[in-house]
UniProtKB/Swiss-Prot annotation:
Keywords: Developmental protein, DNA-binding, Homeobox, Nucleus. This is Homeobox protein Dlx4a. Belongs to the distal-less homeobox family. Residues 182-202 are annotated as: Disordered. PROSITE patterns: HOMEOBOX_1, HOMEOBOX_2. Its main location: nucleus. GO terms for molecular function: DNA-binding transcription factor activity, RNA polymerase II-specific; RNA polymerase II cis-regulatory region sequence-specific DNA binding. It comes from Danio rerio (Zebrafish). It comes from the Eukaryota. Transmembrane segments: none annotated. It is found in: Nucleus. The lineage of its organism: Eukaryota, Metazoa, Chordata, Craniata, Vertebrata.
Amino acid sequence: MTMTSLSESLEASDPSKSAFLEFSHGYQSHQQHSPGVSHAHYPVHGLHQGAHSQYDAAFSPGAASYSRPLAYHYSTAHHHPGAYLPYQHNSAVGYSRVEDADSEKQSSIESGEIRLNGKGKKIRKPRTIYSSLQLQALNQRFQQTQYLALPERADLAAKLGLTQTQVKIWFQNKRSKYKKIMKHGSSGPEGEHLQAASASGAPCSPGMPPLWDVSMPSKGAPIHSGGYMNSFGHWYSGHHQDPMARTQMM
């Protein structure tokens, strides 16, 4: 047996070497087919590159000039007018409420009382200051009658330069003051004035009972201060003289 035949038999009998040769042959065949596969990817890459170029061209600074609009469209020229209607309606309602509040405030002032924003504590108007001539005429008319009819009140207000409301309020206050004096009695100038008015006996005025008939019952006997001093004067004088006599004796 020669050396060449021995080497061929060893190569044929070695399974690992034959497997290595088959693997290397398969790898070479795979490399031969792989360039085609790699070239098949180039068109896809070019397609993506073209899409990116179109996207970049759409948003490039040159494309974003004033002559050409952007990719998204937004128009500010067309607006629905109804979007501003609620605000205008609310403003009109608020103005009407202000007018209503002013009218209510005016009505409350005319009635003789002022309120703070229509709520809270009442604030009365300042009292009317009457002149001496007006007071004299009102007192004379009150001596004649305590109640005025509507024509009489209008005539008296026109003569004195007052309003009918002022005349009516003055007569109301005068009647309430007169009733209070009649109930509790009076010794002041107002009571004397009313007594003189009742004594005059005006035909239109109702009969007024005299105020001086009211008598207050006496409570207990009157106490004289002199009696107190007299009862203790003798004891005080004797007690005062006794120490003086003792000092003289010493």
